[in-house]
């Protein structure tokens, strides 16, 4: 401010002086003119006797005084204003200085502007012939000056932008009470009833008519054991406590219910709806303080279902979905419980033997029997593999499908998961418009089936049997029936049929109709298949998507479930004759949670999922029977947990909890997305991570009872399972084995944090990188992606189809646009009145598919707004060969609070030039989490009509996507399956990197991310630019050849104050390779590592000048001077001093698998012991004396080198022991750091080593496992343990934290030794009677002798699960 002020003062004073002098000159000039004027001069002298007034002089003095006063006032005003301006404090960050080269550039540009102006004026001005030689000289001098002062235009740098407030901050308003005109009780009831699905306005108003207010004083009970369990209780104000009683009369609080939450058990609601209501057994609820409770009787639902029967199927389905996705998810997947969740002894129907029927027979149906074709067997979709679009049958889990026999010529349509063109909206017009249609979608039934069932024009081919049987599988046998039963063994079915067999089957069909309460038995016609499986056959495998109902006729089916963290299966229960199995998965549409295995020969009826839904469409009450059989199998412990575990919803922008809140529960994400943000002491907010479907949130704080460390808010509407702290304590007391599982979960979190915090540098320095991509990579575990075009020229339809084709190779993918939505849900689907129905349908699609793509419209339509609201991530798609622009839709997007992360995707033609000007694309946008360059096939840019485009991509979808294409790379990035390549430093030994790269390409392993240190950063940058090992080898060989030159290093020598060389020659060699390429313009995402000796920290470079940061990462101390960072002037050295193999950084950037190649030198560890002191003369003698024993003692240079690489060595050990890293080290120890002249030899060593390693990978299916979706694999598979042991995180500490239980005042007795899974009868067993002595096989005489041992084993398993009741039946702790 001072310099401009002085300049202004000088300018003002000089201007006044010029004015005064100018005025004086004018006066003199006037006087001179007066004197010389012929007429005026004489007239003046004649009249000189009369005096003339002195008015002009007085006027001048007055004007001068006025000017002086004005100037003085202005000066005083400026001084006062200057003194009043507060001095802003200097920022705490680094002070940027104006460097000398920047000054040179500034003045050089100034001179060039002057030169250009002079040149233009000289060229435009016409000159005479005499001045032409002079002008030529001037032009020549100007050209020389131009050459001397020629300054290239500086490339733009990426502007650092902070995330907008909408990304890091949650909404301040909590709840909708303040902004809604509805009463609080209506809002609370709407929130809790919404758990049962969306009810239309008439239905909801009908329910509200049955609401009852109930006021409670402190200590009053809402309900107690023995009272009816037939209501939903919603807390309007106050606080309720959910308790379980103990044998000593004391109660354990398992859950606190705050205003807005409810107390209910969906299984109890199901009992009331199905007509099997029972009183409370153990659960009670009391008021912790004066409270007001809303009570909604479950009978209100029955009245609603009477008026709207289609809603019955939908509500029961939602209850089943909650049971599987909430209760089982929390208790099995995270707490490791298995057979504790099921009741092992219920009384099924007694079918065989039956009075008056021969024991050797089993019911069959109809008079004709023939072997079914592949059309009758539903192809089961294998996880991680798209279904075969040709409709060919897929092999079973063990390659042995079960042999079905069609009992009649079926006419039901074929069920299959369709891989169809998303743009093909034909056949979708009859989409869901009712609650049953929503249930149909929820059950994941093919749309074509629904169309045919409802009389649509599209009909799937009917299952037409043929006379040619399929190849006989090992798990099934040909049915042979003869009159001598000993000849058939355990296979009672054969080609002979009789009237007696037909009558038996009719009886079995009646039993099935009775069990399912089917009023019209003809509904089973053409929908039932008879199967016989040999001993050991797997009927269905855990995780299967397309499942069926199995009704056991003869024998039994064993139900197994894989244990958590163990490669073992545990038997849950045994399905006896007369039982249904598979109802839960059929009703929910979720994958099967157990494996069905025929431990011995078994015969059963099978109803496919599509046939069962058609039966339900004809008679909706059938769903009640199926649901009741599921509830009958649940253990009383599950019923208790159904009360305690909540299913909650958080709206977009709302905070789940805030930093510093009390930790009283753990959350599991069911669908949606959450973001975790931490607020530092300075008030700055930082993004910690994002959480998607299946992630566990808040477990560390809840188990350690620490306040919440971060604020977690919803990026979009999110559903969660809530596990209260008291419930967790109750489970730990009852099943102590849960403590081991909790220790495993907690140790993973704590060890990850300790690995970040206990490095040689503080966490804030950037040295400690969290090992889990879920914590640091926001674009991981995505479920929904919105695609937004920059301009109308972007081929959106072709782009989305290409991306969907690539994603299909990873998992089921759905593409939605406004046309598809209107075709499937009707023209009014996007109206505001259909808000909840559309949200529910979209949530179902998210559950049914690995990822959902939302294609926005070209303008800001309601569908575009919906896409942005549903998205976990927004892809902004532009054309890389066009001028950087900001689209109109993007400009509208900038004005809205969009919380989803944004990524820029630039499309390039296959034959076009490489990416350029990426920085300009990024700078003109607000904060983007990343960018990608895609080289697209020619068909993407071809101009075709929609019909031709559809025809083209039908052919494309018939082929599997190329894993090396850029769209496959984008698909892996979006699904969290990125494969990273990390190259270590080691001088000339790094030439072997290229050989390993060549072998990697030949093995077919794609690379999505490249990083490196030192020579690894150089090779990695070449590969990220070229994407070809051959071209990388060619350019690296030329550079290595230049490194063997002797003259350039000699000319680069300098006085060794900082380094031996000036670095100029080395800079030129690197610049010749990369020119002025920016990191942002590389084809592959790239990073390298340097050591910042100014801040004593590790620096990770992901943007900026490529050659400078490669040079900085290769800067050896003592040889080359540190490189000044162009951004902040910090001094950068070789990254190998701190992290020579940065696999952990690649992991933090979202890599699922990291291939790390180490070429560093290995230090000698077998050093000599010389005592407490060391004499240099003694060492000299030992070295000079040829007969003396050699001693291994490091010299001063080696000691300094080892000290410099201490952190690097420790980091390398961490990388080697990590489970995500594939560590490779070629045999290059015989080569030295500067052996660049042996390039080809070192390359061959790396190539041969890579061929051997990757050949083994191919034989061991390692590559296929890398490409398998991380969410389709068993997440509970045991992994390699981290060898790092931190003194503050031992097993004892974790056990003490996790095992901590409430004081004995809240002790709860387990009742029986095995909990409720005892001989204490449940309500269902009471109904069935006390007879437990039935025959398991139904016909002991008909069983083959080979199954006797299996029967004994089965009985021993059941005997192990039985226990004698230790207390009266009334004390059994069931719900």
Swiss-Prot record:
UniProt PTM: Glycosylated.
Compositional bias annotation for Polar residues: 9-20, 359-376
Chain intervals for the UniProt region annotation (Disordered): 1-20, 352-436, 449-472, 1306-1375
Side of membrane Lumenal, spans: 1-59
Reactions performed catalytically: a 1-acyl-sn-glycero-3-phosphocholine + H2O = sn-glycerol 3-phosphocholine + a fatty acid + H(+); 1-(9Z-octadecenoyl)-sn-glycero-3-phosphocholine + H2O = sn-glycerol 3-phosphocholine + (9Z)-octadecenoate + H(+); 1-hexadecanoylglycerol + H2O = glycerol + hexadecanoate + H(+); 2-hexadecanoylglycerol + H2O = glycerol + hexadecanoate + H(+)
Organs and tissues of expression: Expressed in brain, placenta, kidney, neuron and skeletal muscle. Expressed in the developing eye, pituitary and brain.
Active site (record annotation): 1014 (nucleophile), 1134 (proton acceptor)
Binding residues annotated for a nucleoside 3',5'-cyclic phosphate 2, in chain numbering: 511-633
Function: Phospholipase B that deacylates intracellular phosphatidylcholine (PtdCho), generating glycerophosphocholine (GroPtdCho). This deacylation occurs at both sn-2 and sn-1 positions of PtdCho. Catalyzes the hydrolysis of several naturally occurring membrane-associated lipids. Hydrolyzes lysophospholipids and monoacylglycerols, preferring the 1-acyl to the 2-acyl isomer. Does not catalyze hydrolysis of di- or triacylglycerols or fatty acid amides.
Protein name: Patatin-like phospholipase domain-containing protein 6
Source species of the chain: Homo sapiens (Human)
Underlying gene: PNPLA6
